[in-house]
Design a protein with these regions (language model features):
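Bacterial N-terminal signal peptides that target proteins for export
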Residues: 1-7
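Sequence-pattern detector for short linear motifs
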Residues: 7-8, 143
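Cleavable N-terminal signal peptides
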Residues: 8-9, 18
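Short glycine-/acidic-enriched loop or helix-start segments at secondary-structure transitions
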Residues: 10-12, 118-119
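Cell-envelope and extracellular/periplasmic
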Residues: 21-227
Length: 227
């Protein structure tokens, strides 16, 4: 590669690096639900040593962190009783604003094929259920892609770009068990409900167990790689 081409590539790449905003995992998006009355962990990446601020509109508080040598940072924000919509703004000098954020009850919908079964084409009277789903806009849905890892991950791959507002279209490929559970919760509690689907048909229960926990069980101590 000649000097002229090298200089051209540097000139193209450096502005991108200098203008890069703080980044968040795909689970933090517009339309998300955060657990009420909790200290909720929010994390992401920024340029090492960069100061990061997280501002929550429900109380106007700002939480500060500094990106580590590897670029990681995290804060814990205090959430109020259920309500919204709110905004969460994350900035290292260039703000990223998450809009239409609700505070409520958040549930993980996990398991095998019985949890994986979707609403569309699988549920009795599913067409009517999909028509009625638009009335439940305070139910929000997050669908996690299937991924394997021997250690907990800081980031996850999600479908549909992140959190979705409940609608007929959006519940179509969401867990039927999870959706009807969330719908009943909403009817009984009357507050925002966040549903996170992370399920995989045919998986063993041990596959959902941490390596540390399996290491405490003699039978699995030497079999962790196969579960």
């Amino acid at each position: 590669m000649n000097l002229k081409r090298t200089l051209f590539l540097l000139a193209a790449v450096l502005p991108l690096q200098l203008s890069a905003k703080v980044t968040l995992p795909a689970i933090f998006t517009d339309n998300m639900v955060l657990q009420q009355q909790s200290d909720v962990k929010i994390w992401g990446r920024a340029k090492p040593g960069k100061a990061v601020k997280v501002t929550t509109s429900w109380d106007g508080k700002t939480y500060a962190a500094t990106a580590s040598a590897s670029g990681g940072w995290e804060v814990r924000v205090s959430t109020p009783v259920a309500g919204g919509p709110y905004t969460v703004t994350v900035s290292d000098g260039k703000p990223v604003e998450l809009k239409n954020v609700l505070i409520g009850e958040v549930w993980l919908c996990s398991g095998q094929s019985n949890m994986e079964m979707r609403v569309a084409d699988r549920v009795l009277n599913y067409e009517q259920e999909m028509k009625e789903a638009d009335a439940y806009g305070n139910i929000r849905l997050l669908h996690i892609d299937n991924t394997t890892s021997p250690v907990p991950l800081d980031e996850a791959s999600v479908r549909h770009g992140g959190w979705q507002v409940c609608s007929g279209e959006n519940i179509a490929d969401f867990s039927a068990t999870g959706y009807f559970f969330g719908k009943e919760l909403y009817k009984n509690l009357g507050i925002p409900i966040g549903l996170i689907e992370s399920c995989w048909g045919g998986t063993y229960a041990e596959s959902w167990t941490s390596t540390e926990a399996l290491s405490e069980m003699p039978y699995f101590r030497d079999r962790k790689s196969v579960v």
